[in-house]
Amino acid sequence: MKFSFVSLFPNLMEFYFQDSILARAKEKKLFKLNFYNPRDFSKNSYHKVDDYKIGGGAGLLMQAEPMYEVLRSIQEKKENPYFIFLNPSGKTFNQKDAKRLSKKEHIVFVCGRYEGIDERVLEIFANEVFSIGDFILTGGELPALVMCDAILRNVNGVLGNMESLEEESFENNLLEAPAFSKPFIFEKKNKKFYTPSEFLKGNHARIASLKTTLASCKTKFFRPDLFLEHERKK
């Protein structure tokens, strides 16, 4: 699988893949990375890529010409690119999207800055437009990294134990069950906090049943919207 990032600040993104799980996956050649800076495709001597909006409005907009050139250059490599634009007006990214997109050959994340990207670029290239929530960020780099991380976790071999993926939050519209580590009794300020005793008895069927019950209770409390969806699909 291949990921390409189109960004005015590629150096902000490269470091994310230098440690931990994703670094090991990259060393195993489970995915490849490319970074493209639209400034390298600007035709003016100052490598300018932004200008004021036609019709007025606050802030600057990333221009169509350099964005077209960089995305067209990616298309011409014929690596089956799937263009994803990051925009607050896009649909909200979720775990189902992460699973679906993990089957793509080559995902290109197009990261805007300033007040966004000339709309005509999206009309020409966008396969999908995503947001990670109803809030505004300085640029599309962080959402792109968030999405890339979530997608890669669904690529076979990236996680050491694929069973952990099946147990994670949002599978079957349930949050992941509460998890506990040693010690069995955690004591602070004369208060004792216990791990559920069923977890220590070794009966895997009963442990699995308890985890499902706890996951259901947790979802009902923290995400009633998900819980209703889970109940509806039973």
Swiss-Prot record:
Lineage, broadest ranks:
Bacteria, Pseudomonadati, Campylobacterota, Epsilonproteobacteria, Campylobacterales
Alphabetical list of HAMAP family matching this protein: TrmD
Query: Which keywords label this protein?
Result: Cytoplasm, Methyltransferase, S-adenosyl-L-methionine, Transferase, tRNA processing
According to its UniProt entry, this protein's organism is: Campylobacter jejuni subsp. jejuni serotype O:2 (strain ATCC 700819 / NCTC 11168)
UniProt KW Iron keyword: no
Q: Which residues bind S-adenosyl-L-methionine?
A: G112, I132, G133, D134, F135, I136, L137
**The EC number(s) this enzyme carries:** 2.1.1.228
Q: Name one GO biological process term.
A: tRNA N1-guanine methylation
Q: What is this protein called?
A: tRNA (guanine-N(1)-)-methyltransferase
Q: Which family does it belong to?
A: Belongs to the RNA methyltransferase TrmD family.
The GO cellular component terms are: cytosol
What does the protein in this record do? Specifically methylates guanosine-37 in various tRNAs.
The UniProt catalytic activity note for this protein reads:
guanosine(37) in tRNA + S-adenosyl-L-methionine = N(1)-methylguanosine(37) in tRNA + S-adenosyl-L-homocysteine + H(+)
Subcellular localization: Cytoplasm
Query: Pfam families this protein is in?
Result: tRNA_m1G_MT
Task: Give the molecular function GO annotations.
Answer: tRNA (guanine(37)-N1)-methyltransferase activity
Subunit structure, interactors included: Homodimer.
